[in-house]
């Protein structure tokens, strides 16, 4: 199997390099790769030449404009990366008869209510990021290519910056913390996403009827506030230097912390379709976060 991975240096892309390697010949590309492997998503049409050069049976797109607040001030760039480029890759995949794997987000929903969203639930993005990611989904579906779209949320990895690292740093520096309590979701490891992707690619190649849209997040749910407390208390139990006392971590509402982009309060995603289709049991979010903490604190 010839696999083209674009966006290989991001959190998910880095883990995909590991997870996809056993499946076949893997060509991993990013915006700073040397020619002819350069994946310039700001010039989406150049991606056709990349696909023609590699001639893959599977294209995995892990590239995106994920700076949610920044997207509000640069919507054209966000649209090029999140909507136009996936559409070009989809057309190239259809022309070659290749499978396109793409990642989307809970931000395509408006975050109302408390029930987990299914794949068929009405969308209603609140931000430029969410809108452009939805447009990317729509472009892929409209292309008619074989595709696998995985919506996810609250993605983290041991490599690079993440929420847990930030909380640990602040907890060691400050006497008090305020953390948002009314946004709820499931922290999902990039390693879990990559492993599910590899499993799903094998399955879809054998059973094409499994292609389509799925939700992929870790099991369980938490708020950013409870997530922060879990991280800090775990580190304290391991003897790490934590300055802030448990009672000095205060919950605050999203409304008290305004940002350029609106965030969905309800980021719960229903994963029953994914688990049933591919015979999976997704682990609880605490398992993945604890594993990540052991890695970054070792």
What are these regions (language model features)?
Residues 41-81:
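NAD(P)H-binding glycine-rich loop region in Rossmannoid oxidoreductase-like domains
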Residues 59, 73-101:
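NAD(P)-cofactor binding segment of oxidoreductase domains
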Residues 141-199:
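NAD(P)-dependent short-chain dehydrogenase/reductase
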Residues 1-22:
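N-terminal Rossmann NAD(P)H-binding glycine-rich loop of SDR-like oxidoreductase domains
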Residues 30-45:
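Rossmann-fold cofactor-recognition segment
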Residues 196-197, 203-258:
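Mid/C-terminal beta-alpha module of Rossmann-like enzyme folds, strongest
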Residues 80, 85-88, 108-150, 154-155:
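Catalytic helix-loop patch of NAD(P)-dependent Rossmann-fold dehydrogenases
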Residues 284-298:
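Amphipathic terminal alpha-helices
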């Amino acid at each position: 199997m010839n696999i083209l991975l674009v966006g290989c240096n991001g959190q998910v892309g880095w883990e995909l390099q590991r997870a996809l390697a056993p499946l076949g010949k893997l060509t991993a590309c990013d915006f700073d790769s040397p020619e002819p492997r350069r994946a310039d998503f700001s010039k989406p049409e150049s991606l056709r030449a990349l696909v023609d050069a590699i001639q893959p049976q599977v294209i995995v797109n892990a590239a995106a404009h994920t700076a949610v607040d920044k997207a509000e001030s640069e919507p054209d760039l966000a649209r090029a990366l999140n909507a136009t480029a996936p559409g070009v890759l989809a057309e190239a995949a259809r022309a070659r008869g290749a499978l396109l794997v793409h990642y989307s987000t809970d931000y395509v929903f408006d975050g109302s209510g408390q029930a987990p969203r299914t794949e068929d639930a009405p969308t209603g993005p609140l931000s430029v990021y969410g809108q452009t990611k939805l447009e990317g989904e729509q472009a892929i579906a409209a292309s008619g290519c074989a595709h696998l779209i995985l919506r996810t949320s609250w993605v983290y990895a041991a490599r690079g910056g993440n929420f847990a690292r930030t909380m640990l740093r602040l907890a060691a520096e400050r006497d008090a913390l305020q953390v948002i309590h009314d946004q709820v979701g499931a922290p999902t490891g990039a390693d879990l996403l990559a492993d599910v992707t590899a499993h799903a690619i094998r399955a879809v190649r054998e059973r094409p009827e499994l292609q389509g849209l799925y939700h992929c997040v870790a099991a369980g749910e938490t708020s950013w506030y409870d997530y922060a407390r879990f991280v800090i208390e775990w580190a304290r139990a391991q003897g790490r230097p934590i300055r802030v006392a448990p009672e000095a971590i205060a919950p605050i509402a999203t409304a008290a912390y305004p940002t350029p982009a609106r965030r969905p309060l309800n980021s719960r995603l229903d994963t029953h379709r994914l688990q049933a289709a591919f015979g999976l049991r997704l682990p609880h979010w605490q398992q993945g976060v604890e594993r990540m903490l052991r890695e970054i604190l070792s």
